[in-house]
Structure formats: structure tokens, C-alpha cells
Swiss-Prot record:
SUPFAM superfamilies: NAD(P)-binding Rossmann-fold domains, Siroheme synthase middle domains-like, Tetrapyrrole methylase. Residues 217-483 are annotated as: Uroporphyrinogen-III C-methyltransferase. InterPro entries: 4pyrrol_Mease, 4pyrrol_Methylase_sf, 4pyrrole_Mease_sub1, 4pyrrole_Mease_sub2, CobA/CysG_C, NAD(P)-bd_dom_sf, Siro_Cobalamin_biosynth, Sirohaem_synt_dimer_dom_sf. Transmembrane segments: none annotated. The active site is at 249 (proton acceptor), 271 (proton donor). Residues 1-203 are annotated as: Precorrin-2 dehydrogenase /sirohydrochlorin ferrochelatase. Then it catalyzes the NAD-dependent ring dehydrogenation of precorrin-2 to yield sirohydrochlorin. Finally, it catalyzes the ferrochelation of sirohydrochlorin to yield siroheme. It comes from Neisseria meningitidis serogroup B (strain ATCC BAA-335 / MC58). It catalyses: uroporphyrinogen III + 2 S-adenosyl-L-methionine = precorrin-2 + 2 S-adenosyl-L-homocysteine + H(+); precorrin-2 + NAD(+) = sirohydrochlorin + NADH + 2 H(+); siroheme + 2 H(+) = sirohydrochlorin + Fe(2+). NAD(+) binds at residues 22-23, 43-44. Pathway: Cofactor biosynthesis; adenosylcobalamin biosynthesis; precorrin-2 from uroporphyrinogen III: step 1/1; Cofactor biosynthesis; adenosylcobalamin biosynthesis; sirohydrochlorin from precorrin-2: step 1/1; Porphyrin-containing compound metabolism; siroheme biosynthesis; precorrin-2 from uroporphyrinogen III: step 1/1; Porphyrin-containing compound metabolism; siroheme biosynthesis; siroheme from sirohydrochlorin: step 1/1. GO terms for biological process: cobalamin biosynthetic process; methylation; siroheme biosynthetic process. This is Siroheme synthase.
Amino acid sequence: MNYFPIFANLAGRPVLVVGGGAVAARKISLLLKAGAEVRVAAKHLNAELSALAAENKILWLAEEFRAEHIRTVFLIIAASSDQALNRRVFHLAESCQKPVNVVDDRDHCSFIFPSVIDRNPVQIAVSSSGSAPVLARLLRERLEALLPPSLGDMAEISGRWRDAVKGKLKSVTERRRFWEKQFNGRFAALVKNRQNTLAERELAGQLEQSRQNDQGGSVSLVGAGPGDAGLLTLKGLQEIQQADVVLYDALVSDGILSLVRRDAERIFVGKRARGERTPQEDTNALMVRLAREGRRVVRLKGGDPFVFGRGGEELETLARHQIPFSVVPGITAAVGATAYAGIPLTHRDYAQSAVFVTGHRKADAPDIEWQTLARSRQTLVIYMGALKAALIAERLQQHGRSPDTPAAVISQGTLPAQKTATGTLANLAELAETAPNPALIVIGEVVGLHEKLAWFGENGEGENRVGQTYPALGGLNAGQRAA
């Protein structure tokens, strides 16, 4: 974070602007909207600023900048056409520990101006830290188009009702849920349609019946996807933004966790093959306890909760204890990681089916049907199999799969650090040995398409490939794509 985002209350505070031209006028316009007491140090003013001075909206000092001008002001803006003067203002302000901005000179600023979306009292600031002002402006334009003009009215009405809601609903959780419901319901729709009187009546009615409608605690089982925060579903984002507490595992990326509601409690309940482990029974008991406390719990799991995620076991526990629950599916690693590696799971020339299996089973689980897994013309995806890669390769070859079958190990799938190492079934153990976890094993002729279809990260530039040729793919030329 290059700059700390902060909103300053300038109402009635003295602010010094050095300069009397168009650049100074633009900054002064913003300062006046914020209620600042604007003082202008300049020998001459342009027509716009002269009019403001005549109306006593700004205090014109009618002289060149002097060091004494900065002593009694809250912050300083240097907006003259004289660069040497602007930098002198900067150094004097710095020596007095006063916030200072030299317009269009990032190296001489202790604060900068963001692009602003103004729906007063709602304000949204967008900044590129001065690196790409045009990008910040484009982002502001997109946000302007997304946010309704009625947003300010909604905030003003809500502000008038805050005390009433606080008096009726005693806990922070109750109040937060109440407002979330209003901002996503009929109240918001009425304000959007400029029916503010009806909106306030709706608010009053909702508040009157809010205590009776409180449903207490619940658990939402949310699939976080394979890692890339952009692959989290909209429903999943809504759930983690409304959660009181989030129980997450080791496969949930930092990018996903950064989207969790800031005030929500976060509890790690993960499992790692070579390290920290939270017993599943403890996680189940924790979900039940938190829900019974009336909290909105999100059980956030990497990938999809019902694909080797023990989601079914967790829901059985909740059902047994009569805890309300819901499920938000996620993109499983076999789908996400292979797509980012340029490996299609099915392809009518090479694979008519895809099989997902886990390399980490219960001790009393039935024997694996290796004969079925060793079939050709299918794609085999193995979760949590890196530690058993040698055994997997041996058994598949024993049951008829060719040692020349293309194979890949995808680690850190869909994340910037994603690596895809390709080879054959014969050297699968070698590929897996150096792959960081989490890693996914993919076996099948479709792996041969990786070289042509890789598009993401380093693999998109042709790196991390074990040199192999695959006869089955010989018909695909550099400019040709299979159907």
C-alpha cells in the first residue's frame, strides 16, 4: 500500500492554495464542496477565482507566498505555474509537518488527490498512487455508470434512522443483518425510484417486525474455487461479505480471504499433508457451536465443497443438530487448474470421459479399481496424489496404461505462481517430486495439447516443459486446432 486511504473532515478548516490560475481553481472548487476555509496566496487571480473572492467564498491574501502563510493552516496545495515556488512550498510544509500536495508532481507530495465518485454522503475514491492517472479515471467512469444516483439519498435516509434501529435492535449483528436486508430489498428499490416517503414507511415496517423475523444462526458451505479470486462465484462473494465468522482451510487463497467482510472473525481449520491439522470432528463441533450462538457462519473450502472436500460429512453433522444450512458450489481444481494450464479435460479426438479420484483415502476405504482408471481415451485427474505419484504410475502401468501416456503435474493452479510440469507416466514421480503443494496430477492424451494451448502465466510462454513428443497429437500443426 503506497498511500493510506483516508477521508479528511475539512469543514471550517483553513487550507492554503498557492497559485491563482486554472489549476488552483480546480482544486479550490473541490475544497469548497468539502466546506474548507480556503486561503489563496497569489498576486493575481483569474476571473473564476476573482468572482469567488468578491463573493467572500475564498480569502485572497493578495500577495506572493510567504513562509508565514503555512503556520496556521491545516494543509497546503501548491498549484502555481512556477515549479521552483511549488517545491519551496513543499519543503517548507514538510519542515512544519504539514500535509502538502504539489499538483502533478508526485515526488513533492505527502498526499495525493484520488479520482472521486460523489454520491454525497457516499464517496468513493479511486487512486493508482499517481502511477496511472488515466487508468484511475477509467475506473471512476465505470463505477459512475454502475452506481445509481439515488445512492446518496439511500445513505441520508439510513442515517436518519440509525438511532431508531439502534434502539430497537440491541446487537451489532442484528443491526448489520437488518441493514443488509434493506439495502438488498424493497427499501432500496423505492429509493432508486425516488419514492423516498414510501421508502421510509417500508423501513418503519421492516423495523417493527425485524425481531420476530430473526432466524438466528446458520451455516453456508461455500466453495472458494481453485485459487484465483476472480473465479469465486457472485453468490460466494455475497456469503463471505455477510458472514459473522469464516472457517477456512489451507486451500483458500489470500486473494479470496481479502474479500471476506473486514469485521468478520476468521478461524483457520485447515489440513496440510505435512503440517498443521485440525481434526474434522473439531471443525464440525465448531460450526454447530457458532451457529447456536446465533452467528452467520461461512465454511469456506477450496475448490468445490462436494468434490473431495468432505462437505457432505459436514452437512450431515449440521442436519443431525438441526442447524439451517445452504451450499454455494465452487469451481473444482480439476476444472480450474486444467483450464489455466491449457489442458482440456475432454476432447473428441483423445478423451471421451474424465475421471476424478483422490490420492488421500480413508484407511478402511475399498481398494481402487485400477483397471478402470487405466483405460485409454479418458482423462484421469488425481487430487492430493503428489506424495503417491510413484505408486500411482506403477499401478496404472501394471493395469495396462502405456508408460508413454502424457502426464502433467499442475501446482498452485490458477494463481500467479502456477507451474505446469509435463512429461509421461514413466516419469510422473520425477515431475511430482519437486512440485509445490497444492498439486494436481493429470494423466491422458489431452496433456499433449498443453504445449499448444497454454495461455496463463509462465507456461503461456513455453516454460516448464519436459521435452516430449506425442505421436497421438502428430496431426495437429502449429496453426491448427482440434475440434
